[in-house]
């Protein structure tokens, strides 16, 4: 009987699970035209949620960029890989500012403006004649790394936030590139 209780308790008590999101869009424009819009690591003007971007080393690996959000707050990212010929780059989030503080399970918890942890992503373009397929992939954990997360930092909050960013970014990129 005690073995059964132990098994049931361990199944219920688990931490966060790595999440994955991928969005893809076909743009009716040549890859070179699309790449010109997104290739500069220090320019995220194509992403609707971003007010401004600064980066310390441009498109060089290790470049740190700070995204200032239109709704307030910042996200700091590091460029991990950049390939101009393949029209792709990869980055990871290194810091996220706090949106608010809540009390959860008797403790004060800082809710980040983007409810994820250990977030890494890549953007890849593939030329298909006069069209371009843009793929944006992300891997991440929910923001709350312990068991019993608050609503603001659970898997659903993380998945919703990531999906919204990827979809809105790609939709706006399509609009800009097809002008």
Predicted regions and their residues:
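Hydrophobic ligand-binding cavity/cleft-lining segments
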Residues: 9-60
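Structured segments of extracytoplasmic/periplasmic soluble domains
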Residues: 37-47, 82-85, 128, 169-172, ...
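Glycine-rich portal/gate segments that line the openings of hydrophobic small-molecule binding cavities
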Residues: 45, 53-118, 133, 176-179
């Amino acid at each position: 009987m005690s073995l059964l209780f132990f098994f049931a308790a361990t199944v219920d008590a688990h931490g966060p699970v790595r999440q994955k999101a991928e969005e893809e869009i076909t743009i009716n424009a040549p890859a070179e035209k699309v790449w010109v819009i997104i290739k500069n690591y220090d320019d995220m003007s194509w992403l609707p949620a971003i007010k401004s971007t600064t980066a310390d080393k441009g498109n060089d690996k290790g470049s740190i960029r700070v995204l200032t959000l239109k709704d307030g707050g910042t996200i700091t990212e590091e460029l991990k890989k950049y390939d101009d010929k393949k029209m792709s780059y990869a980055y990871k989030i290194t810091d996220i500012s706090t949106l608010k503080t809540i009390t959860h399970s008797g403790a004060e918890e800082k809710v980040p403006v983007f409810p994820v942890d250990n977030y890494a992503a890549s953007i890849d373009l593939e030329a298909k004649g006069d069209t371009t397929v843009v793929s944006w992939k992300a891997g991440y954990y929910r923001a709350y790394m312990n068991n019993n997360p608050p609503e603001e930092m659970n898997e659903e909050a993380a998945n919703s936030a990531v999906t919204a960013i990827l979809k809105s970014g790609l939709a706006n990129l399509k609009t800009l590139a097809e002008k």
